[in-house]
């Protein structure tokens, strides 16, 4: 799998069944111990995921926490998600994989994963095995009780982590409501709650982040979901950090990627990286459409 090779259809089915058994036991707020390296969107950029492991350390030597969006937009969604799920099955205590807004049946039919499965396997079975598995992915993680990690952001219907623990996550990502918000929301310069330009989730201001962190005894909300040119970006007076781990996103954005290392004492440091050198990849001119949900 490390050589960007595919499994056959039956192997994928078996892999997904095994992964379900493991993920079923995990919480909506999955507890994670430091040291751990926290990663943002990967989006099927397999060679850049290899670069991430080169920079951050191989699994299982390094503990990893991925905050979703493994598929769509990049050319190697199949190989990327297969590898991450295989690592989860092999080293369940060493890697945590959360759900992103792209780990959904609906979104993957628009942004590439469905078409890629069809192209590589000749039918939609592999897409079905993976999207069924996505329903089992934990929504959020909590590192040593202090750093709260999730794909998108906060929700007006959630005040405490216990509210999240009480959600039924075994379903397709809904169009609205708390589960949707956790995967779709974005921090914003404006205070309070706002309508999201994405058409799902909300924008939330610094007042919201500070209140949430204080109420839940947190020092930081770590999230992904937004392209940031340096690979990471602080906002809300360091109550929130955005981490994005797909360099030169969509093979055309020119951004750096980053990962956040948390040591034994929860001290953080960021490692930035550029795209892996590429050979023989098609040149992209097509503009990928932005969300129109």
Curated annotation (Swiss-Prot):
Required co-factors: Mn(2+)
GO molecular function: metal ion binding; protein serine/threonine phosphatase activity
GO cellular component entries: chromosome, centromeric region; cytosol; FAR/SIN/STRIPAK complex; nucleus; spindle pole
Keywords of this entry: Centromere, Chromosome, Cytoplasm, Cytoskeleton, Hydrolase, Manganese, Metal-binding, Methylation, Nucleus, Phosphoprotein, Protein phosphatase, Ubl conjugation
Location of Phosphotyrosine modifications: 291
Stored Gene3D superfamilies: 3.60.21.10
InterPro entries, sorted: Calcineurin-like_PHP_ApaH, Metallo-depent_PP-like, PPA2-like, Ser/Thr-sp_prot-phosphatase
Active-site annotation: 102
Ranges that cross the membrane: none
Gene Ontology terms describing biological process: mitotic cell cycle
UniProt-annotated location(s): Cytoplasm; Nucleus; Chromosome, Centromere; Cytoplasm, Cytoskeleton, Spindle pole
UniProt catalytic activity: O-phospho-L-seryl-[protein] + H2O = L-seryl-[protein] + phosphate; O-phospho-L-threonyl-[protein] + H2O = L-threonyl-[protein] + phosphate
Post-translational modification: Reversibly methyl esterified on Leu-293 by leucine carboxyl methyltransferase 1 (Lcmt1) and protein phosphatase methylesterase 1 (PPME1). Carboxyl methylation influences the affinity of the catalytic subunit for the different regulatory subunits, thereby modulating the PP2A holoenzyme's substrate specificity, enzyme activity and cellular localization.
EC number from the UniProt entry: 3.1.3.16
Residues recorded with modification Leucine methyl ester: 293
Cofactor stoichiometry and binding remark: Binds 2 manganese ions per subunit.
Binding-site residues, Mn(2+) 1: 41, 43, 69
Positions of Mn(2+) 2 binding: 69, 101, 151, 225
Function of the protein: Catalytic subunit of protein phosphatase 2A (PP2A), a serine/threonine phosphatase involved in the regulation of a wide variety of enzymes, signal transduction pathways, and cellular events. PP2A can modulate the activity of phosphorylase B kinase, casein kinase 2, mitogen-stimulated S6 kinase, and MAP-2 kinase. Part of the striatin-interacting phosphatase and kinase (STRIPAK) complexes. STRIPAK complexes have critical roles in protein (de)phosphorylation and are regulators of multiple signaling pathways including Hippo, MAPK, nuclear receptor and cytoskeleton remodeling.
Membership in a protein family: Belongs to the PPP phosphatase family. PP-1 subfamily.
PANTHER family: SERINE/THREONINE-PROTEIN PHOSPHATASE PP2A-RELATED (PTHR45619)
Assembly with partners or alone: Found in a complex with at least ARL2, PPP2CB, PPP2R1A, PPP2R2A, PPP2R5E and TBCD. Interacts with TBCD. PP2A consists of a common heterodimeric core enzyme (composed of a 36 kDa catalytic subunit (subunit C) and a 65 kDa constant regulatory subunit (PR65) (subunit A)) that associates with a variety of regulatory subunits. Proteins that associate with the core dimer include three families of regulatory subunits B (the R2/B/PR55/B55, R3/B''/PR72/PR130/PR59 and R5/B'/B56 families), the 48 kDa variable regulatory subunit, viral proteins, and cell signaling molecules. Binds PPME1.
Protein name: Serine/threonine-protein phosphatase 2A catalytic subunit beta isoform
């Amino acid at each position: 799998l490390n050589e960007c090779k595919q499994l056959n259809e039956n192997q994928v089915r078996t892999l997904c069944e095994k992964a379900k058994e493991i993920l079923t036991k995990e919480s909506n707020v999955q507890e994670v111990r430091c040291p751990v390296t926290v990663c943002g969107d990967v989006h099927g950029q397999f060679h850049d995921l290899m670069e991430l492991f080169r920079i951050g350390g191989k699994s299982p030597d390094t503990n990893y926490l991925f905050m979703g969006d493994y598929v769509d937009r990049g050319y190697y969604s199949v190989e990327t998600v297969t590898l991450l799920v295989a690592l989860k099955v092999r080293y369940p205590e060493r890697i945590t994989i959360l759900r992103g807004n792209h780990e959904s049946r609906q979104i993957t039919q628009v942004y590439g994963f469905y078409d890629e499965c069809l192209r590589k396997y000749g039918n939609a079975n592999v897409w079905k095995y993976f999207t069924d598995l996505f329903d089992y992915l934990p929504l959020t993680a909590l590192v040593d009780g202090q750093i709260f990690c999730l794909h998108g952001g906060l929700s007006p219907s959630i005040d405490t982590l216990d509210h999240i623990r009480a959600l039924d996550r075994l379903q397709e990502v809904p169009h609205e409501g708390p589960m949707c918000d956790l995967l779709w929301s974005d921090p914003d310069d404006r205070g309070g709650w706002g309508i999201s330009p994405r058409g799902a989730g909300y924008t939330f201001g610094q007042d919201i982040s500070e209140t949430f962190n204080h109420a839940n005894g947190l020092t930081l909300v770590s999230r992904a979901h937004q392209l940031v040119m340096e690979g990471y970006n602080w906002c809300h007076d360091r109550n929130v950090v955005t981490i994005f781990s797909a360099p030169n996103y969509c093979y055309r954005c020119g951004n750096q990627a980053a990962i956040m290392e948390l040591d034994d004492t929860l001290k953080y440091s960021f490692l930035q990286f550029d795209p892996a050198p590429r050979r023989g990849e098609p040149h992209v001119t097509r503009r990928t459409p932005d969300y129109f949900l």
